[in-house]
Amino acid sequence: PRNHSSAASDVYKRQQVGCVVNCSFCATGKQGFSRNLTLSEIIGQVLIAENSFRSIDNPKEKNITNVVMMGMGEPLLNFDNVVNAMQIMRHHSAYNLSKRKVTLSTSGLIPEINKLSKVTDVSLTISLHAPNDKLRDILVPINKKYPIKDLLKSVKNYVDSFDDKRITTFEYILIDKVNDSLEIANELANLLKNYPCKINLIPFNEFSLSEYSKPSNNRLRAFKEYLVKKGFITTIRSTRGDDIMAACGQLVGEVKDKTKRKERLKRQVKALELNA
């Protein structure tokens, strides 16, 4: 996606074909995992975006100003290629992007987060989506291996390893009547009250085979306003690409039903009985 309101351009890049994390609100995991992208494929996405932007604006300018490792796949599962790509993008002979202009988003792989501070100092975004382990185990299954308490400790260690004052962004997909109540907003505020952070709310983007729904604008605004009153910098991400099923959580080649064959047959039989 591109920010059309200025000359600045944000590039969201994918790092894998498919995804093994399999968050329940994301279409990407439904297609399974194929492979990691190579270093050249990751950098190639930036070059393609740059050429596209040049055709719109000044053809001689490099106007890519922000790169976010937040597309299809979990960046930290393609650790070496992603780190090398970020280093290239920050090099003065390439895009000369500062550490604050390159962001890595992760679902919370603690060992890789712990390694990250030794090789880079880019901005970190955490796909949180729930304030407690019971709910996050459902939404982000990797939480069963890396629970919230341990994840936040790892994030704090990453931030504290640098001298500058920086904040962590926590991404939070809002799903209707799943994680969007004011009670949950209060729980989220209590969880993050000791962390310098920004909370980025993302309305759920619906896709085929999903059992979830997008929250109403009223519930979305109420959730945000509650967090703001609690003192948090809170934003609502503008949905882009949903008209072509390419918004956050919709990136997929073909949504395939990965349900076990036995369960699929049961559903098919039930459907036939209802239609009989």
Go through each PLM region and give its residues.
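Flexible, glycine/proline-enriched loop segments at strand-loop-helix junctions
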Residues: 28-37, 72-74, 100-101
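Radical SAM enzyme core and accessory elements
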Residues: 241-276
